[in-house]
Amino acid sequence: MQIKAQDTGQQKKSCLLSNIRNKWKNRNRGSFRQWVGKLSNGLMIPIAVLPIAGIFLGVGDAIAGNAGDLTGLRYFGLFIKNGGDVVFANLPILFAIAIAITFSQDAGVAGFSAFVFWAAMNGFMSSLILPFDKAGKIITDTSTPIAGFKVLYNKSVPVHAIATTLGLRTLSTSVFGGIIVGALTSVLYKKFYAIRLPDVIGFFSGTRFVPIICFVVAIPVALILLMIWPAVSIGLNAIGTGLGFLGGKGYGANSLIFGYIERSLIPFGVHHAFYAPLWYTSAGGSLQEIVNQQVWIRPDFHLSDNYVARVIGWVDPNNSSMYIIPGALNGQNGSSTGNTMSKDLNGALSAYMSKESTAFLTWKDLVDGLTFKGNFDKMAENGLLDGSNKIWLGLNGSGILGKKLLLSDGNVYTITFKTFANTTPIAWSKGAQAVLPLNASSTIVNNPTALAAATQSNNNTNNIKLYPVNSFRVAVESLNPAQYSQGKFPFMLFGIPAAGVAMILAAPKDRRKEAASIVGSAAFTSFLTGITEPFEFTFLFLAPWLFYGVHAVLAAVSFWLMNILGANVGQTFSGSFIDFILYGALPDGRRWLANSYLVPIIGLFLAAIYFPTFYFLIKHFNLATPGRGGKLITKKEYLASKAAAKAEGVSGVAENFTQTQIEAGILLQAYGGKENIVELGACITKLRVTVKNPELVKEEPIKELGAAGVMRTTPTFFVAVFGTRAAVYKSAMQDIIQGKVNWEALQKVINTDQLAVEPKETTPPKEVMPVVQDEIVILSPVNGTLKSLNQVPDETFKQKLVGEGVAIVPSDGHFKAPGEAGVKTELAFPGGHAYIFDIDGIKVMLHIGIDTVQINAKKQPGEPLEVFDIKTKQGEYTKEKSESVVEVDLKKLSKKYNPITPFVVMKESLENFKLVPIRQRGEIKVGQPIFKLVYKKSQA
């Protein structure tokens, strides 16, 4: 018995240790994926603004580049272009702010603190980054060519590792720096936003302390980055170069691999975090080298011959040798420093052979000679020299595309996207080919033989070195602009719609109309906007193998074919028809060789695979796609049932809540109640919810609200695909959790609605309109006497320029919110004299007294106010009826100002509602109905 007891004890001990080990192993299980998902969500905030910025960048450049002698038109184009430029130039800052806000529960002060952090960090770093020249001497002027930088103990940091931000020379941390700053800011915010400091410095307590601590922490972060980031930057550049060579010499293998991984990450919502480094950093390629003053067009003048312009030269067809010959471009002299090129070929060659000559020795000089001088410098300042997509946009707006070089055989070479793409075949036209002065002798320009003779003669006397053809390469052999994004166009514009047609035709004939209404809209969304999730999730949950084994593979093939066949079609957001026109068709219309014609060719090829493959697999495996399985409950059907319930008189008090609030409440119940919610998040199409107890989650109500699918990526992390409604639901659910909406009352409405009896057997309406409140009652905000607006000594209110309503002469200074619970303080003027409230979408203004804006006009932020003691905050919602808004010292106010208080419904709210007075004269008590708004359509 004793032995058994010991064995039992050992077993218990072993079991206990095993449990501890298992808990330790699983302590962070899934947390990293959740973090990456949240990061991906944050990245989408700045990415969302890139389409409009890209449009301005492209359109502005098109106007400026074709303005000719019309100075006004040119400046108008630059005006538009620069607006787009500045967004891309400050992309790292935007990422920092977005990440900080995302990880801090949408706290605005976190975004402000992130900007302080970013600015301070780069300011600290700039003082320790010192440029040096070829001799290794520190440069103190702006004209000496920069050979590199000294950063702390690192004595030779390459130029591409340094960038310009906020006008400061700093490390090229790009979006990685923004993510680092945003993440650190969110950590500091969560730790210090509620800090209480001693009373003597109490002003700096709470959220005011967050930007202060961010400023201080920026010091060690700056020093750490100065120590390690140059090596990281060099590593990223090497990755970009390596991936680029894999594309150029590996037959597009990089884009094939990228395409599959990018699609495969869609269900987890982390694909944004995957592609962002390749789109926006040097990991996706770099133009830094060819615009750096140290990269000479002539190889023996510099360390590397990897970045030689392949069109700047002459080929001897007899021995396959080539000479580098500089010359004037587009009628300009061939010197960036004012030296005039010789008018004859021999003079040009002689000038070039002198190492002291500056006549188009570098790519930067070449580009400056072809464009408005400094355009590539501007690209560098705006951060458009790194990242596959940013480079494409930079070139598109640089002014270099479309410029022409006069070749010695009489032909003209036009610089296009192909000049900078490693998929461009390395081939030279037969005969001589060189850049020459436009005023060179016509005998030489049009006579390759004479050119060869002159060159050979010059070679004999000046010892000109010959280079074999294969030593001269494309502009950047490791770069292909837009290679990590353009592959989306064929499968989004053609492949997915073809799969959609297959789904519709695979449904029984009597249900094809139903299938078309669901699948057709999702496929059209993919075509028009490039948002594919609504379609992809219709079959992802039914047959994951169809997604990963067919769709993701074909997407990868799309990327691969676009790359190896030589397309360079840009985009800012996704592979939509809109982006195709703006960044494919329009550049091709300007003959910039984006080769957008490949999109329909490859797209039709993929469609021919998508359609039969999806049709056969759906039929063969009897997949329950729309129209084939149980009837899908759409959002329209759900709203119709609610309308029927209301017709039976069941919905009762539903008018107190908006439709979005009701649906958000249903979602909260489906996720186990608001107490079960740990964290909420949303991207463009997906609602992300982390819960405490996953057993409480019910997926059916979520699907009934229109979710294309619900996926659990970790035991407690759920993703529901709602399309563009995801962010709306997230905000509404957040409001309920934070107490901005009466949860108990909302639950009663939801539970009552769900008790709705079966609708009568009558013909249902053809179209069910969203539930709109027929009447909204506005309550008096204060005790007092009602007056007409005509009696207000202010023409703005008297003439009803702001809106319609009444005036109140207050009898006390206790001002309340003019409605039941849920009134939002849309705007609270800093001086305390005026407020705008939002009552179920109706905007109501309360202006206490006349000219009272003067009372606190000279007060600085943080100083105590006179007369007004504000009890609400901008953006807050009331939790009960007639909640206190502001306490007013009415006696003090009345000494200098007229206390009559205009209370009006603003004009914007009167477009769909008619104001009906309930009380117009006499005494009124706070909380009593003062007027109501009647929905105009309900009167028809």
Swiss-Prot record:
The lineage of its organism: Bacteria, Bacillati, Mycoplasmatota, Mycoplasmoidales, Mycoplasmoidaceae. It is found in: Cell membrane. This is PTS system glucose-specific EIICBA component. It comes from the Bacteria. Residues 285-478 are annotated as: Unknown. One of its GO terms (cellular component) is plasma membrane. The phosphoenolpyruvate-dependent sugar phosphotransferase system (sugar PTS), a major carbohydrate active transport system, catalyzes the phosphorylation of incoming sugar substrates concomitantly with their translocation across the cell membrane. This system is involved in glucose transport. The EIIC domain forms the PTS system translocation channel and contains the specific substrate-binding site. CDD domains: PTS_IIB_glc (cd00212). Its EC number is 2.7.1.199. One of its GO terms (molecular function) is protein-phosphocysteine-sugar phosphotransferase activity.
